[in-house]
Amino acid sequence: VTLKGASLDNSRSGVISAKGAVDIRTGVLDNSRNGGIGSNAGITLVAARLDNGQQGRVSAKGLLDANLKGLDQRGGGVLVSETGVTLDLNGGTLVNRDGGLIATPGALLLRQLGAVDNGAGGEISSDRAFTLAAASLDNRGGRLIGAASLTLRIAQALDNSLAGVISGAAGLSVATGALDNAEGGQLISQGVLDVSSADLDNRGGALSGKQSLRLSAANLDNRGGLLTSDGELELTAGRVDSADGGEISARGDLRLTVERLVQRQGRL
């Protein structure tokens, strides 16, 4: 199936389905409100903008290749492939909040992302290693899951508060500007957890690297928060406030290089 045009409205339970490949090239593509685009082979989407929100669904058994300038998946939109997903936003915005899902057991290639909103139950996941590089990332209450390793490169701010979860099973590397991991935020890995940020707010949050944890931050607020590793833990920061039940712990070597440490009713 090949469709070309200035715009395409497949919303309100519209269906585009094929046993073979689906190729859609248009301006604005509206697949919202239970719209469905499916293929037993691959799907290619080229559009200025894709509205896949309110339970829209794009699913392929083969490769799913989407070249867009904006993607809105809020309200349960689904973008999935059994083989692999390539998503190029050309600097545009990705909205995947409120239950949006981007997932594949195969390779997940995310290119030229601008601002990313994956909050309030949004999920971006792959069974393979993947990298998410973006201008900013809002993952408040969202999930970023790498069943292998996960790399985040965020130019501005990363907000993982309100029980956000960022996990790379084999390893997690995060480089960002300001990082908010407060109020139940979790950065976790069964391997090495490596975090580099400007100011880090970890009040009531947790950073856990089972193999090791390396953290470098301009300043760290760890009041009521947890930094922990079953291996070694290395912390480099300016001012560190780990009072009020904050904990910094390691079963292996613990190395702190800080300008000032506040530890009232904290644990080290």
Feature roles, as predicted:
Residues V1-G5, G20-G27, A41-A48, G62-G70, ...:
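Well-ordered beta-strand segments characteristic of repetitive beta-sheet solenoids
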Residues S11-I16, S32-G38, G53-S59, Q73-V80, ...:
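Short, T/G/N/S-enriched strand-turn elements that build extracellular solenoid repeat scaffolds
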